Amino acid sequence: CCLEIGSAIGYSAMMLVSNINNFKVETIELNEERYLEAVKNIEENNLKSQIIIHHGDALSFDLEHLKIKKYDCLFIDAAKAQYQKFFEKYMPLVADEGICIVDNLDFHGMIFDIDNIKNRNTKQLVKKIKRFKDWIFDNELYDVEYHHVGDGICVIRKRVAQ
């Protein structure tokens, strides 16, 4: 099972359950319009039995509302400035042998050239993404693999005591 933070229109969740046998995804989406579109897409593709979708803010979401209590995977693709908060809240729900995937860590390549970003808000956002990247790579509790795929992805595993 996978917990996804940031459903958007449900595409990632639908791809996961369509390509992995007997897989379930539980997902949280803040934006009502995207949530409703995701519900529609999930229903039209007959995937309601495999995808549980919640509407709400993942940062204030009551964990008691989650139907699944332990996950094999956490997929974070929501508000980029909140990545560390999402990670800290939801990573404890991932099984010891599970993974966390964090998407869009290059932020259109801007992460590599922060000083040349003119827009103040964009610069602040990119700095927060960079702080998360630095924090997770320096965190001794996790093993982190970075992949230059798409807009940059990290695969994070809990470090196993030797």
Predicted feature residues:
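S-adenosylmethionine/decaboxylated-SAM
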Residues: 1-162
